[in-house]
Amino acid sequence: MKHFDVVVIGGGHAGCEAAATAARMGVQVALITLRKSGLGVMSCNPAIGGLGKGHLVREIDALDGIMGRAADEAGIQFRLLNRKKGPAVQGPRAQADRRLYREAVQRLLAEQPGLTIIEGEVVDLQVNGGRVQGVSLADGTSVGAGRVILTSGTFLNGVIHIGDQRRPGGRMGDDPSQRLAAVLGELSLARGRLKTGTPPRLDGRTIRWAELEMQPGDEDPVVFSFLNRVPKARQIACGITHTNARTHQIVRDNLSRSAMYGGHIEGVGPRYCPSIEDKIVRFADKEEHQVFLEPEGLDDDTVYPNGISTSLPAEVQEAYVRTIAGLEDVRILQPGYAIEYDYFDPRELRPTLEVKALGGLYFAGQINGTTGYEEAAAQGLAAGLNAALSIREREPLHFSRSGSYLGVMIDDLTSRGVTEPYRMFTSRAEFRLSLRADNADQRLTPIGLDLGCVSDARRESFNKKRELLEKGRALLEGSSFTPSQLNELGIQVSQDGMRRTAFAVMAFGEEAASAVARGVEGYGDLPEEIRQQLAKDGLYAQFILRQEEEAAALKRDEAIRIPADFDYAPLSGLSSELKAKLMRARPSTIAQAAQLEGMTPSALTLILARLRRAGRDAAAV
């Protein structure tokens, strides 16, 4: 029987990242997947990154993960989302060529020393003395393991729904994992059903592109990996169109034939990626919904219509799609479908992602109730690191909420659990001002260097960047200006006679940063990337101090009581999701409110402010 230090089950985004990460830590790893050719497949949308998600990809890359590098090789349109908002919430996103992404992932895995890829289906876990010892394959093969990481995606008891038709499937074209699901059921872990969906795939040759609005990528594309500077593939534009009243009427007339609305699905779907059926029902007053037509590759005529995922019958899909401008003659290559699958309550896990009830077994990805490639890959990285550290008998790595979005996600999952597919947003992070996408390497690469999971090339690149940042910060801190000097530079400040360092002046925004570059000798010679990061550091410096003070104050305020009839509706800063959960749960204290799934310190601060205002009003009567 072959034996490996770590065995990873599943070759999706979580599995690939887990296997590569554990191998970088110097342990022997086996990645078991149904088909080697399926490694790196993008099962749903052909894109990486986005709001919150792009931050996760940067954090994965900072620890030398593979997702960012693969996305840079395959990216055919890069856009920085939220570009008009503050730097902290700007998220890099890339539309990817499916083939190029798959090939990049497979090459990166093949080049990784210590990683063996095995084709097969895992059907059982070998357990002895309360610890997992290995796995059994469908062909009778046994593989020994010191640690096992399960990244099953949507395969556990997966069922594909198209209208009233249902069939077993982990995704279109692949069988589900039923025998392993039965084995996991014997562990008595809390489990549930979730669902996700995908839109029909379109033949781009039958789309009237000339009639559509086209959206190009950014002129100054922001890539994912800190080792790269520019995209590697040819860049293209996407099409934009919209649904209309006819579209909505067809969907409305056939809601009973939808798998979701026809009662065929019990699993809960992702709130922030609704199907076209959900959009028509939940947003009945909207006259149209935007649809992005995303080519799936440079040499592929398939188009992904982002925004119309569905579980309606194939003939209904064809009818409503052809009411959309530019798609009147379109041919559907593959119908959209919903997929329902098992997940396990992530509160059954330690913060290392190890299962509490069975030592040596780790869960990562959609099995933990998350949705999205990026969330899965980040969990895979965390599980791979901790499994390897455990093999080496080293201290586990606990990602903190204050240090990474990865830490926010794992803490949310393991302490609050999920009732619907969990997606990362910047609003989930109370320390988001310091958790920017551009400084992920400064936050996490030092940890990777200490752990030994970072390549020599990344070490060299990181050290060079850190030296430049330190040099730039010293120049800024060592230069100061009087109010008169600042006025001469075009920066209007109070004439209070106080000198201000150049770093402090960064808080006044982009124009001030540009003026400082002209006023500090040697600063303008630094690379643009370094000056941009220092400007963001200065911009947020005072806010971050205040943020830390608020977090400390929240800790002190946990015992404050919330009236049973407290009205959350007027709190405009709360999301509708949080308002609904608060009104349903009716927490009696701030501490109880803090434990709700999706709760954030900023939301707690809003509630506290309203409670204090109500208290002052009552005292004044």
UniProtKB/Swiss-Prot annotation:
Main location: cytoplasm
Domain of life per record: Bacteria
Residues holding FAD: 10-15, 122, 177, 366
Keywords, ordered alphabetically: Cytoplasm, FAD, Flavoprotein, NAD, tRNA processing
Residues annotated for NAD(+) binding in this entry: 269-283
One GO cellular component term noted in the UniProt record for this chain: cytosol
Entries under Pfam families matching the protein: GIDA (PF01134), GIDA_C_1st (PF21680), SAM_GIDA_C (PF13932)
Transmembrane annotation, as ranges: none
Cofactor requirement: FAD
Subcellular location(s) of the protein: Cytoplasm
One Gene Ontology term from the biological process aspect of the record: tRNA wobble uridine modification
GO molecular function: flavin adenine dinucleotide binding
SUPFAM superfamilies: FAD/NAD(P)-binding domain (SSF51905)
InterPro entries the record matches: FAD/NAD-bd_sf, GIDA_C_N, MnmG, MnmG-rel, MnmG-rel_CS, MnmG_C, MnmG_C_subdom, MnmG_C_subdom_sf
Record NCBIfam families: mnmG_gidA
Function of the molecule: NAD-binding protein involved in the addition of a carboxymethylaminomethyl (cmnm) group at the wobble position (U34) of certain tRNAs, forming tRNA-cmnm(5)s(2)U34.
Subunit and interaction comment: Homodimer. Heterotetramer of two MnmE and two MnmG subunits.
Family of this protein: Belongs to the MnmG family.
Protein name per UniProt: tRNA uridine 5-carboxymethylaminomethyl modification enzyme MnmG
Organism listed in the record: Cereibacter sphaeroides (strain ATCC 17029 / ATH 2.4.9)
